[in-house]
Amino acid sequence: NNTTDVKKICLAHGNEILKLSDENRILNSLNKADLIIYNSQFTKNKTFKNFKNLKKFNHKIIYPAFIKKISENKNNKKKYDLCTVARLEYRKGHHLVFEAMSILRNEYKIILKYAILGDGPELSRLKDLVLKFSLQKQVDFIHHDVSNEKIFKNSSVHIMPTITTPESIEGFGISNVEAASYGLPCIVSNSGGTPESIGNNGIIVKENNPKQLVKAIIDIFKKYKSYSRKSYLFANNFESNKKIKEYLNAI
């Protein structure tokens, strides 16, 4: 077989475009591709900014979330007000949710329950912060063996206030779309490609801003039914068959 007849497709997801120490190798790989598929407009823009000599043809944005099924979540007795389904990394912003919960409790007398599903290097530090903010009765760390579905079905809002660090960015935010498919409104920050993972089914706040998180949480619950309905509609855009067609049309 002549390998030159095989179409070469490159998927760009975010963090790899920060590795400027590997600039020549990455640029060479990108320029060999017949098509580059980005997981967000942010990732595409960042790639062109970091790699000035990138060829300007055959670039496509396809959001990577695939939703197999959207069904109404009829659980009206949810255990958690907030949840975050994500790897336990600093850039995911769990610590900012703790700060917001502390403000809500101390200044607004609002007590929320928060589920964190995931594993990662921040676990020990996050547990220390729970003690610092006296949130032991409000925050549960869920073992990663528990399914995303179980957490989403038992939570009201998905919150992921990501922050940008020199070595890491959020290219998109698949868990926000997955949460929306269970009717959860989403609160995210304006960091990286995260804002592209929600529509009118949530609120975008400035990154690293607990006070804006507080306002967003209050606003979401004031209009909860409306945001929840919009979440189902938004998630429908990521239904598996639609996404497969996007990829097939691209290649």
Write out the residue ranges for each language-model feature.
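Donor nucleotide-sugar binding/catalytic pocket of nucleotide-sugar-dependent glycosyltransferases
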Residues: 31-71
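Conserved donor-binding/catalytic core segment of Leloir-type glycosyltransferases
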Residues: 37, 74-92, 98-101
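A charged, aromatic-enriched C-terminal amphipathic alpha-helix characteristic of glycosyltransferases
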Residues: 70-71, 208, 222-251
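A structural motif in glycosyltransferase catalytic domains
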Residues: 82, 97-100, 114, 213, ...
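Nucleotide-activated donor-binding/catalytic signature segment of Leloir-type glycosyltransferases, i.e.
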Residues: 124-145, 157
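Acidic donor-binding loop of glycosyltransferase active sites
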Residues: 153-169, 184
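Short hydrophobic beta-strand element within catalytic cores of glycosyltransferases
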Residues: 176, 181, 185-188
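Conserved acidic donor-binding segment of nucleotide-sugar-dependent glycosyltransferases
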Residues: 190, 200-210, 219-224
